[in-house]
Each structure stands twice: as C-alpha cells, then as structure tokens.
C-alpha cells in the first residue's frame, strides 16, 4: 500500500457539499433519491448538518450527478457545461508557462463555458487579485446551498 492510502479510505466530506451538489438536481424538479442510493448515501443524512459521508461515496455521487444531468456543472448555472468541457479548460491552463498566464486564460475561457460567471485578474507587483463574479443571480438567496456550492466548486 502506498503512503497515505489509509487516509483516503477514511476521508470524509461534510454533508453540506452533498446538499449543494444536489441543488441543481432539485432545481430541475428531479428527485435525487436514486442518485443518493446508487452512491450508497442514506438520504436521511441530509437532514443533519453535522453528517459526513465517505469521500468515495461523494466522488461517486459527483460523477453520477454530472452524468445524469449531462452537465459537468451539476445544473447550477443557466447554461450546462457539457461533458469534456472541464478537461479542455484544464488542458488549456496546464499548458500555460506561468500562473499569471494560466489565470488570464481562465478569465478568458470560463465565461465561454459558464456565461453566468466572470473572472478578473489584477496584478499588484508580486501579488495578484482574483475576483470571481456571477453575472446573474445564481439563486434567490445568497446562502442558497447551490449558489454556495457553485462558488466553492469553482474556487477549488
């Protein structure tokens, strides 16, 4: 076994990430029960904020939601992010010679994939400021689980 493999088996994810991930499913009027069951997640855990699930179950759910919605952005934005889009974005960024170049590419390309979002990058000497802005409200309330998850997902 490789170093750290025991940690991967015991790693967990807060249930809030599951709630956020499922927000797009619910917005489309779909019941997430089958997706949760297929990933081995007890739906009752969603009612308890302190709940955690295994990282492996979360990863399974993450992939199932993207596949079910045909959207790598999980139905959280007005325009779906078609399968393969994220890989193309990552490849474009990975080919950059510098972090500055990668961030500027991200600022140009992300709005093509997700028109609801803009990114601004400003350099201040050796430091840079990165601003992620929604061009339209992603939800009626700023604390909406889907809106919060959308920003967390994009910032990871």
What do these predicted regions represent?
Residues 139-156:
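Core beta-strand-centered patch of the WYL/Sm-like small regulatory domain
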Residues 132-138:
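Conserved short histidine dyad/triad with adjacent acidic residue
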């Amino acid at each position: 076994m490789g170093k750290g493999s025991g940690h991967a088996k015991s790693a967990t994810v807060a249930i809030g990430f599951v709630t956020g991930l499922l927000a797009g499913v619910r917005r489309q009027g779909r019941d997430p029960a089958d997706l949760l069951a297929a990933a081995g997640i007890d739906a009752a855990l969603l009612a308890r904020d302190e709940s955690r699930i295994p990282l492996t179950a979360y990863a399974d759910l993450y992939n199932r939601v993207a596949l079910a919605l045909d959207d790598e952005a999980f139905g959280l934005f007005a325009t779906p992010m078609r399968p393969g889009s994220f890989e193309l974005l990552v490849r474009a960024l990975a080919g950059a010679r510098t972090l500055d170049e990668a961030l500027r590419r991200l600022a140009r390309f992300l709005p093509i994939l997700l028109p609801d979002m803009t990114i601004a990058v400003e350099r201040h000497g050796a430091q840079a400021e990165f601003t992620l802005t929604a061009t339209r409200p992603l939800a009626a309330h700023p604390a909406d689980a889907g809106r919060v998850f959308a920003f967390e997902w994009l910032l990871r």
